[in-house]
């Protein structure tokens, strides 16, 4: 009848995953086909930090990307997943600085720039492959031969090209403006690297004496100025009030004497001032506050910088005009007592001196957010420094229009509003960083400080006609990491060369990323790409057609995962498993705070008492896809992961059941498809339709759900059972039909599920392919199932649906009445429609086999029925006679005890939830859990009461 076939009892992911991946990679299956007649499909991966390691966010986004890549490859598209890593300037430099400090007791300055950069390249060579290897473990079908690094020669050339061209167009300039300054790391940092920490501070109320005998409306000769930053008051160049604040309108245009510094500064009116904050009078320090900087520009105020790059008080103030150039003629001497003081020491002294002069009005407690550098760990300072800037407004206008016109779609659409709000209020972008690791700015200076911009020094001399005797020194700064990653989609494809890859794969199709970098990365990619990449008609190209924005992966309590919270989960641990001891070491091993380490250890022991079991890559991927509801943050759920590992096992066991069935007959000959055969093929066709529609809308959760629902609830729970009577009692034609249907539906199901769960589907498919006459090497290159327009069998679907309802009703009667599954029952129908009577007539044998029935009878309209338990299916009444099956009194006594037990539980929880003290103190999650239990007990109680009534009526 069929070949003898053996298959392991269980699927063992660790035994097959890495070998399968190696085979795929070595066979070149991840490479584009480069078939110019096929549509191209390309995704550029958001480049992770080269020295980093994979976290759950990476695993989540990359699973979604690989699903799309595998799907499009199976669709026959010329598919490229462009991978690579980011040099991650400040992060990588700090890792290596800490390393040499710990191991050698040295700083980067001990090495010097060139030697230190070589040290970083060594570190990159040593650790840079970690994340690539971890990405392989996820099953990512990446063309690794095309892997790029943001400081590769090719990408470095692209960076220089963009810088030089923008400079030539007047869109890059050097100027002195206010930036986020990290006084520990001595570099400007981006807003993304600033962490605003809640802090309990103070609001100091200082008296600033009015000059020239002026008085307030209530006769005072001073204004009370509220500030959270006394240490910068030596740099005040005005005090401001709201123009409509009647308390101070008469003083606008007059002056106050700045205490301690003894210089007069004007009283100005500006709508920036909040009349309700403090006294409604604020000091304006344009050199040390971003809001004040804007006020200063509006009122043409001088900028007085009183801090050094270490955030100490300067010996001499630096006076700058609103044009960023030194300003002559403005006196702002720093009193000798404060020179050289560290900023917070200066704060204490200034407050004490105000008090000594009788000018400290009051101090109020004040909650505020203090900006910290996320790498340096100290409060950042708004600082006037010389930096390079991109004038981005002209680039932003084009980038806004691309989204407005629908050339780029955001999914979910609401993120367009976030994009527009940022882009329409865009400021010039500070692109220089005071670091050593990164793309060094292609600008050179001569002895007089003249600036020359070109791709290299040789070009500088040629472009500006400089003699070899002119000594040139390259700018020490490097570019913001976001500058090079902004070129990612086109620089990785060979730009500025017009390569065949650029022509074939650009624009890319979709970008999958987090909402937090829409401005820092997504917007800049759109701006740069549209400025530099044009199609054959000269029209600006977008970098991607769709931006799919994911939420964050949080822990089970909804907390953001972070090392300091000790709740980080490593995706590799989900795949391979990890012991409790190793997990504790991972979470607390390098912690300097013993109390925090103990708190984390306690929580970890409670949550993972036995460590984390191995689940395999497919279970992890399926879970991530199933949780991917559009744009929402996701609370990780270990139970879902276990459930989807069980799902993978279910798929394996079902395949084993099919392929090891000794009665399977795939020989040539007459075939007679049963109702069940027609139904499962129609259901599969519908599942393909659901999957394709869902994927086109980036609803990965619905894709996973469609596969789960079909595999578990239709194929395994029903169809496999429906074939058993055929193999037991069917004729040869029916057995051949069931055999063909089983193996063909299974093979197509594996292809359908492959983009989500690549390893188990490949492993099973290698065993199935011989049964369906396929000789190809890999499921990866097989066509993805199509929706067959004529493949929907509505009649079969309706008939099986009715039969399933009847079978479930009979099984429920058995369970509720404690009748063993092995005992045959009689089934009576009353009020059966003509349509359902026809189904019953054709499928009586199937119904008897599936519901374990001895007799099936349709009662006439007025025919009396024996004492029976009844269920409704639609309008039809199903009756199962109970004579001889149960001891009525004993069963009622047992159910009475059950009812009492459930009633007591419901009452206990009701009392708990009506206790105001409990509800006020208990966490929301605990209350929700109690309500869940209450609903479960209430539902159980109602079911038992129904059973009681049914048996009482016998």
UniProtKB/Swiss-Prot annotation:
Single GO MF annotation: valine-tRNA ligase activity
Protein's organism: Haemophilus influenzae (strain 86-028NP)
Subcellular location: Cytoplasm
Binding-site residues for ATP, renumbered to this chain: 563
Motif 'HIGH' region positions after renumbering to this chain: 48-58
Function: Catalyzes the attachment of valine to tRNA(Val). As ValRS can inadvertently accommodate and process structurally similar amino acids such as threonine, to avoid such errors, it has a 'posttransfer' editing activity that hydrolyzes mischarged Thr-tRNA(Val) in a tRNA-dependent manner.
Name of the protein this chain belongs to: Valine--tRNA ligase
Cross-referenced InterPro entries: aa-tRNA-synth_I_CS, aa-tRNA-synth_Ia, Anticodon_Ia_Val, M/V/L/I-tRNA-synth_anticd-bd, Rossmann-like_a/b/a_fold, tRNA-bd_arm, tRNAsynth_Ia_anticodon-bd, Val-tRNA_synth_C_sf
Transcription regulation is among the record's keywords: no
Ranges spanned by the short sequence motif 'KMSKS' region, renumbered to the chain: 560-564
Domain notes from UniProt: ValRS has two distinct active sites: one for aminoacylation and one for editing. The misactivated threonine is translocated from the active site to the editing site. The C-terminal coiled-coil domain is crucial for aminoacylation activity.
Source species, domain of life: Bacteria
Family of the protein in this entry: Belongs to the class-I aminoacyl-tRNA synthetase family. ValS type 1 subfamily.
EC number(s) on file: 6.1.1.9
Reactions that this protein is recorded to catalyse: tRNA(Val) + L-valine + ATP = L-valyl-tRNA(Val) + AMP + diphosphate
Entries under Pfam families matching the protein: Anticodon_1, tRNA-synt_1, Val_tRNA-synt_C
Known partners and oligomeric status: Monomer.
């Amino acid at each position: 009848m069929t070949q003898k076939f053996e298959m392991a009892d269980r699927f063992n992911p660790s035994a097959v995953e890495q070998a399968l991946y190696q085979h795929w990679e070595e066979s070149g299956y991840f490479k584009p086909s480069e078939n110019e007649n096929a549509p191209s499909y390309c995704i550029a991966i958001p480049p992770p930090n080269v020295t980093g390691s994979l976290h759950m966010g990476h695993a989540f986004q990359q699973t979604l990307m690989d699903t799309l890549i595998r799907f499009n490859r199976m669709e026959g598209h010329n598919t490229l997943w462009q991978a690579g890593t980011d040099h991650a300037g400040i992060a990588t430099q700090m890792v290596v600085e800490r390393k040499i400090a710990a191991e050698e007791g040295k700083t980067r300055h001990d090495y010097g720039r060139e030697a230190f950069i070589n040290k970083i390249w060594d570190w990159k060579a040593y650790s840079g492959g970690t994340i690539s290897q971890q990405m392989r473990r996820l099953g990512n079908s990446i063309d690794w031969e095309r892997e790029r690094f943001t400081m590769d020669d090719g990408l470095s050339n692209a960076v220089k090209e963009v810088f030089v061209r923008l400079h030539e167009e007047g869109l890059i300039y050097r100027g002195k403006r206010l930036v986020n300054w990290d006084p520990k790391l001595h570099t400007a940092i981006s807003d993304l690297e600033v962490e605003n920490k809640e802090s309990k501070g103070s609001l100091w109320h200082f008296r600033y004496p009015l000059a020239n005998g002026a008085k307030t409306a209530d006769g005072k000769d001073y204004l009370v100025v509220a500030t959270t930053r006394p240490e910068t008051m030596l740099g005040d160049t005005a005090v401001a009030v709201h123009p409509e604040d009647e308390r101070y309108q008469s003083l606008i245009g007059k002056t106050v004497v700045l205490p301690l510094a003894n210089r007069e500064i004007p009283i100005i009116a500006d709508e920036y001032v909040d009349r309700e904050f403090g006294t409604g009078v604020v000091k304006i320090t344009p050199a040390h506050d971003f809001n004040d900087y804007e006020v200063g520009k509006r009122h043409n105020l001088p900028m007085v910088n009183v801090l050094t790059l270490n955030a100490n008080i300067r010996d001499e103030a630096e006076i700058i005009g609103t044009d960023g150039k030194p300003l002559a003629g403005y006196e702002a001497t720093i009193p000798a007592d404060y020179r050289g003081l560290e900023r917070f020491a200066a704060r204490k002294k200034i407050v004490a001196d105000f008090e000594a002069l009788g000018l400290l009005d009051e101090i109020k407690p004040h909650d505020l957010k203090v900006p910290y550098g996320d790498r340096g760990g100290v409060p950042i300072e708004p600082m006037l420094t010389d930096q390079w800037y991109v004038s981005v407004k002209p680039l932003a206008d084009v980038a806004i229009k691309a989204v407005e016109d629908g050339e780029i779609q955001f999914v979910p659409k609401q993120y367009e509003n976030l994009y527009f709000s940022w882009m329409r209020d865009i400021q010039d972008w500070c692109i220089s960083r005071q670091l050593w690791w990164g793309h060094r700015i292609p600008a050179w200076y001569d002895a007089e400080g003249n600036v020359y911009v070109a791709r290299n020094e040789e070009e500088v001399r040629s472009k500006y006609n400089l003699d070899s005797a002119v000594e040139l020194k390259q700018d020490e700064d490097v570019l913001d990491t976001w500058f090079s990653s902004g070129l990612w989609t086109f620089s990785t494809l060979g730009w500025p060369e017009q390569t065949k890859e650029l022509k074939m794969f650009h624009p890319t199709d979709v970008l999958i990323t987090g909402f937090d970098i829409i401005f820092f990365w997504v917007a800049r990619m759109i701006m740069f790409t549209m400025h530099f990449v044009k199609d054959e008609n000269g029209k600006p190209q977008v970098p991607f057609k769709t931006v799919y924005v994911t939420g964050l992966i949080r822990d089970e309590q909804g907390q953001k995962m972070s090392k300091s919270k000790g709740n980080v989960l490593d995706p590799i641990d989900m795949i391979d498993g990890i012991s409790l001891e190793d997990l504790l070491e991972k979470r607390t091993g390098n912690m300097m705070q013993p109390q925090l380490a103990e708190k984390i250890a306690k929580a970890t022991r409670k949550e993972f008492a036995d460590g984390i079991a191995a689940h395999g890559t497919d279970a992890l991927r399926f879970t991530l896809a199933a949780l991917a509801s559009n744009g929402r943050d996701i609370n990780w759920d270990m139970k879902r992961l276990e459930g989807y590992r069980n799902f993978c096992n279910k798929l394996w066991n079902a395949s084993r059941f099919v392929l090891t069935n000794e009665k399977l007959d795939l020989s040539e000959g007459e075939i007679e498809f049963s109702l069940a055969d027609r139904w499962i093929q129609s259901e599969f066709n519908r599942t393909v339709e659901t999957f394709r529609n869902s994927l086109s809308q980036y609803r990965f959760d619905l894709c996973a759900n469609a596969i789960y629902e079909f595999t578990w609830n239709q194929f395994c729970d029903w169809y496999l059972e429906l074939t058993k009577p055929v193999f037991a009692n069917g004729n040869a034609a029916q057995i051949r039909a069931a055999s063909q249907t089983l193996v063909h539906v299974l093979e197509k199901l594996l292809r359908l599920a492959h983009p989500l769960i690549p390893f188990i589907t490949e492993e099973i498919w290698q065993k199935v392919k011989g049964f369906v006459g396929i000789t190809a090497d890999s499921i990866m290159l097989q066509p993805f199932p199509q929706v067959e327009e004529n493949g929907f069998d509505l009649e079969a679907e309706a008939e099986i649906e009715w039969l399933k309802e009847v079978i479930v009703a009979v099984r429920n009667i058995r369970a509720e009445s404690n009748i063993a599954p092995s005992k045959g029952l009689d089934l009576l129908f009353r009020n059966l429609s003509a349509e359902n009577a026809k189904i019953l007539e054709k499928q009586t044998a199937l119904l008897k086999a599936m519901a374990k029935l001895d007799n099936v009878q349709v009662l006439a309209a007025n025919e009396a029925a024996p004492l029976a338990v009844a269920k409704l299916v639609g309008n039809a009444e199903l009756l199962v006679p109970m004579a001889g099956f149960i001891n009525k009194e004993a069963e009622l006594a047992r159910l009475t005890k059950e009812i009492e037990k459930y009633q007591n539980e419901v009452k206990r929880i009701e009392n708990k939830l009506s206790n105001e003290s409990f509800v006020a103190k208990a966490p929301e999650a605990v209350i929700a859990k109690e309500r869940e239990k209450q609903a479960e007990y209430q539902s159980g109680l109602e079911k038992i009461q129904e059973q009681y009534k049914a048996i009482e009526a016998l």
